[in-house]
């Protein structure tokens, strides 16, 4: 097994051990809490682990630039701590997914029911009183909040092995900034879904870009890179270089996601075809589409986008409209340009070749993914 594969296995073991310990705590309180830990552990069992891998290889790269090399014992201790740091990022991401699916009213995640739907099904199957839907909402809010708290706990425990207090403080600052930025991005995303129809078409592109920057680019790629480098005591110049690599890559990552959200294969993505259209997502792809339509067609497209109840033929019409407007081709070009910008920035980083090669391989996976 290669180094990345070993890391992913160790992260899964870390998360499983953490959840098993919490299962004991919950069981001692009440057996009614078992579904909470079941749904949490199920969600943590899958995913691409991009954030963890970007964090780890950034740490490896930053270590190679350190003026004083670590001893083998110090490196092993730091590597063990990095597993915890990476696991915390994955716990945080899973929490964000729980809340994101609820906000988007998305019924599925990775081909299985979303957490709020699992709680809803539990309510219905148990024959309980009240609204199953409201129970699902309440359960998923609480599970997401719980996982956010657990991510901070795992992160804090990992930082106990930080080489010094300066590094510990830098890591905490980066983690805190990530939390603020992704929550801000989530709010702006919800805001756009509800307010975009009251704004001009000309405003849509800039506002969609802003959501993309904070909800995805900084959170998914830049923050893990900066946390990993900070844990290695990376210098400010290196962190700036990693941002120059991570932000355009994160933007390209989201543009790929936007395309998959409209044109992706459900068998691969685990979500229904055109799911972003049903959810009324105000993506860059949608903004470019509206810019390229006549007022009459634009009005029809806008009405469909805000309806939330779309038939398959309406999805097909919107997909065709997006393609014929030129928005799909423009989005793909943007993605390619951002990817080139990112890879050029990576090439200029003064880190060792092993870290650079692994970061490049990760970047290419992000850009070319099909799910």
Task: Report each predicted region and the residues it spans.
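Conserved N-terminal diphosphate/IPP-binding helix and adjacent helical/loop segment
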Residues: 1-89, 94, 98-133, 186-206, ...
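All-alpha helical catalytic cores of prenyl diphosphate-utilizing isoprenoid enzymes
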Residues: 25-30, 42-52, 141-150, 154-263
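A glycine-biased, small/acidic residue-tolerant capping/turn segment at secondary-structure junctions
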Residues: 30-31, 256-269, 297-305, 314-316, ...
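Residue-level signal for inorganic ion chemistry
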Residues: 54, 151, 185, 286, ...
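Active-site alpha-helical segments that house and flank conserved acidic catalytic motifs
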Residues: 80-113, 173-184, 218, 222-229, ...
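Divalent-cation-assisted or electrostatically stabilized phosphate/pyrophosphate-binding catalytic cores
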Residues: 109-144, 196-217, 240-244, 266-292, ...
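C-terminal charged capping/lid subdomain of soluble metabolic enzymes
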Residues: 316-371
């Amino acid at each position: 097994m290669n180094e990345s594969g070993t890391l992913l296995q160790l992260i899964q073991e870390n998360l499983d051990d953490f959840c098993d310990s919490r299962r004991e705590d919950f069981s001692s309180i009440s057996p009614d809490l078992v579904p909470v830990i079941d749904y949490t552990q199920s969600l943590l069992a899958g995913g691409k682990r991009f954030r963890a891998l970007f964090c780890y290889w950034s740490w490896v790269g930053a270590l190679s630039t350190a003026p004083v090399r670590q001893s083998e014992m110090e490196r092993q201790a730091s590597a063990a701590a990095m597993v915890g740091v990476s696991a915390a990022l994955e716990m945080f991401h899973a929490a964000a997914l729980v809340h994101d699916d609820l906000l988007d009213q998305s019924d599925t995640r990775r081909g299985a029911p979303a957490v709020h739907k699992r709680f809803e099904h539990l309510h219905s199957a148990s024959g309980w009183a009240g609204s199953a839907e409201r129970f699902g909402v309440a359960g998923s809010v609480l599970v997401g909040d719980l996982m956010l708290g657990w991510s901070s706990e795992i992160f804090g425990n990992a930082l106990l092995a930080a080489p010094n207090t300066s590094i510990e403080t830098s890591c905490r600052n980066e983690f805190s900034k990530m939390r603020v930025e992704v929550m801000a991005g989530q709010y702006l995303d919800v805001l756009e879904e509800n307010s975009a129809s009251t704004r001009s078409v000309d405003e849509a592109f800039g506002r969609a870009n802003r959501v993309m920057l904070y909800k995805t680019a900084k959170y998914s790629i830049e923050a893990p890179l900066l946390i990993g480098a900070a844990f290695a005591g990376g210098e400010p110049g290196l962190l700036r270089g990693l941002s120059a690599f991570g932000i355009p890559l994160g933007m390209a990552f989201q543009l790929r996601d936007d395309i998959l959200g409209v044109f992706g294969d459900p068998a691969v993505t685990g979500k229904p075809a055109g799911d972003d259209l049903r959810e009324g997502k105000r993506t860059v792809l949608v903004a470019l589409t509206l810019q390229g339509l006549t007022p009459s067609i634009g009005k029809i497209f806008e009405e469909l986008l805000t309806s939330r109840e779309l038939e398959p033929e309406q999805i097909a019409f919107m997909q065709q409209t997006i393609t014929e407007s030129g928005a799909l081709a423009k989005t793909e070009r943007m993605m390619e340009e951002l990817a080139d910008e990112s890879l050029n920035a990576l090439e200029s980083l003064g880190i060792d070749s092993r870290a650079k090669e692994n970061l490049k391989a990760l970047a290419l996976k992000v850009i070319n993914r099909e799910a």
